[in-house]
Amino acid sequence: MKKSTLALVVMGITASASVQAAEVYNKNGNKLDLYGKVKAMHYMTDYDSKDGDQSYIRLGFKGETQINDELTGYGRWEAEFAGNKAESDSNQQKTRLAFAGSKLKNLGSFDYGRNLGALYDVEAWTDMFPEFGGDSSAQTDNFMTKRASGLATYRNTDFFGVVDGLDLTLQYQGKNQDRDVKKQNGDGFGTSVTYDFGGSDFAVSGAYTNSDRTNQQNLQTRGTGDKAEAWATGLKYDANDIYIATFYSETRNMTPISGGFANKTQNFEAVVQYQFDFGLRPSLGYVLSKGKDIEGVGNEDLVNYIDVGATYYFNKNMSAFVDYKINQLDSDNKLGINNDDIVAVGMVYQF
């Protein structure tokens, strides 16, 4: 698709919303909330495998039970269902989140299951584009960078009730070897710290993860080493209808590429958004991931694009969106990564 045509599309449409869950049950210390989203979406691009319908449905619940005055149990489940597949197709559903745990007042919470990795505590701040974004160092089932399985997670807010706005995460991930080699991981741990200066409009965060790699991963052509390691740091401002966030991260022997893994990546993301009173929320962002010291390649951009989008909120449940991914990768990049632009347009119903 010509970039001039894409630009005209971008000028014409608008983008997505977030709302609260619907309370299904709340009685005798037991509470259950149901939430969901229908995203009717179409991609326009010269990249054949992405062009066309990309619609999906997400459904989840969050429940909690009051065990006593100090202890609360909780659980969460979320799944996604493809809306662009034939009814006869397999693999139309995937579990995004599934964990359960307990919270003991100021001492914090502990849970286990499929959850968000510690590094995503930083990366989530820029994962705010209407459709794209959040894909430099954060990837699903890639150690503890995003959603992953086998996570034991301890979270503490306001640091045991002593320091307002200081949040701590400690995480352990058990090994997962019964899957595609790029989705495997050995035992690992992660941690993150976030501080908003006692409830101010500014916040800073940092995270670190370190994991064993599997034997199969070390047999790949690219990216060897016993450990997969990552760190990230971020800044956020959220006030006066303005949202600004940025982060920088580095990974070692972790980020999947053609033929294996990148020995090192340097990653940067930024987003700026403004919420108008009449419902429009324009968005401007940038995402960059540079692969370093790749066998047979050297240094090469893995992700590099400017993102221009907008969201229009009809009300708390309904929105429309457009998101224009302006790809900055070279057409002759040595890893054969697609460099076509993509425009995503659609509507979202959420509850």
Curated annotation (Swiss-Prot):
One of its GO terms (cellular component) is pore complex. It holds the Pfam family Porin_1. Keywords: Cell outer membrane, Ion transport, Membrane, Porin, Signal, Stress response, Transmembrane, Transmembrane beta strand, Transport. It is a multi-pass membrane protein. GO terms for molecular function: porin activity. Induction: By phosphate starvation. The keyword Ion transport applies. It comes from the Bacteria. It is found in: Cell outer membrane. Residues 1-21 form the signal peptide. CDD domains: gram_neg_porins. InterPro entries: Gram-neg_bact_OMP (IPR050298), Gram_neg_porin_domain (IPR033900), Porin_dom_sf (IPR023614), Porin_gammaproteobac (IPR001897), Porin_Gram-ve (IPR001702), Porin_Gram-ve_CS (IPR013793). GO terms for biological process: monoatomic ion transmembrane transport. Its main location: membrane. Uptake of inorganic phosphate, phosphorylated compounds, and some other negatively charged solutes. NCBIfam families: PRK10159.1. Homotrimer. Belongs to the Gram-negative porin family. This is Outer membrane porin PhoE. The lineage of its organism: Bacteria, Pseudomonadati, Pseudomonadota, Gammaproteobacteria, Enterobacterales. The gene is phoE.
